[in-house]
Amino acid sequence: MLIPKRVKYRRQHRPTRSGVSKGGNRINFGDYAIQALEPAYITNRQIEAARIAINRHVKRGGKVWINIFPDRPLTQKPLGVRMGSGKGPVEKWVANVKPGRILFEMTYPNEATAIEALRRAGQKLPCKVRIIKKEDQF
């Protein structure tokens, strides 16, 4: 699972989901990529599920890059606990994703197989995504 090794502060304020991605919206490493079309919190489990979906479909011969990291903690109080008495424990780690952000990149010799693998990975994510190619970028 993807979680930070150590953090300066264990609990943080909830990150904002408004606006568009300022950086990380170009393909740098691979030939194909998944791009987010709406804001979302993507958990470490969802990132891992998408990565496994890609690897199971392509098997060998390609390379996958994960461009997001779940570095923000989300806290939640246990069920049946009254209001007050401090902030709850960390429930999960999320990556704050804004529209336009490249989530995964990959390279693979066969285009149809690569696009199908990214489509399967996109179904594991909680936001609308699109698949883009490196040559389609402006």
UniProtKB/Swiss-Prot annotation:
Q: Which Gene3D superfamilies match?
A: Ribosomal protein L10e/L16
- PROSITE patterns (UniProt xref): RIBOSOMAL_L16_1 (PS00586), RIBOSOMAL_L16_2 (PS00701)
The biased composition feature labelled Basic residues covers 1-16
Question: Where does the sequence pass through the membrane?
Answer: none
Q: Name one GO cellular component term.
A: cytosolic large ribosomal subunit
| Gene Ontology terms, MF aspect | rRNA binding; structural constituent of ribosome; tRNA binding
What Pfam families does UniProt report for this protein, alphabetically? Ribosomal_L16 (PF00252)
SUPFAM superfamilies, per database record: Ribosomal protein L16p/L10e (SSF54686)
Write the record's keywords in alphabetical order, separated by commas.
Answer: Ribonucleoprotein, Ribosomal protein, RNA-binding, rRNA-binding, tRNA-binding
Segment Disordered: which positions? Answer: 1-23
What biological-process terms (Gene Ontology) are attached? translation
What's this protein's function? Binds 23S rRNA and is also seen to make contacts with the A and possibly P site tRNAs.
Q: How does it assemble?
A: Part of the 50S ribosomal subunit.
Describe the family membership recorded for this protein in Swiss-Prot or TrEMBL: Belongs to the universal ribosomal protein uL16 family.
Q: What name does UniProt use for this protein?
A: Large ribosomal subunit protein uL16
Instruction: Give the species this sequence originates from.
Output: Corynebacterium aurimucosum (strain ATCC 700975 / DSM 44827 / CIP 107346 / CN-1)
